[in-house]
Amino acid sequence: MKRNIFCHFMKNFHERLDFPPYPGSIGKKIYKNISKKAWEIWKNHQTILINEKQLNMLNKKDRKTIEIEMINFLFKNK
């Protein structure tokens, strides 16, 4: 059975994620407030950012950059 949540990003009810997609409190917040559809949109945007900015996910600074971009993308009003 699909569970719908009010997605903060989409501003509408959509299917909930199956599990927190990110560790820690940020992952819990995403799980409670972001839909599967919005998470897919973020993953596509994340790929573009990594490629355009030539980020290396083995580098801690680059991972922090993506984390900040993710929070801004999913939770900041447009």
From Swiss-Prot:
Gene source species: Wigglesworthia glossinidia brevipalpis
Role noted for this protein: Could be a mediator in iron transactions between iron acquisition and iron-requiring processes, such as synthesis and/or repair of Fe-S clusters in biosynthetic enzymes.
Disulphides: none
Gene Ontology CC terms: cytosol
Listed InterPro entries: Fe_traffick_prot_YggX (IPR007457), Fe_traffick_prot_YggX_sf (IPR036766)
PANTHER family, A to Z: FE(2+)-TRAFFICKING PROTEIN-RELATED
Listed Gene3D superfamilies: Fe(II) trafficking protein YggX
Protein name, as recorded: Probable Fe(2+)-trafficking protein
Subunit comment: Monomer.
NCBIfam families found in the cross-reference section: PRK05408.1
Annotated TM spans: none
Keyword entries, A-Z: Iron
Example GO biological process: cellular response to oxidative stress
GO molecular function: iron ion binding
Record-stated family: Belongs to the Fe(2+)-trafficking protein family.
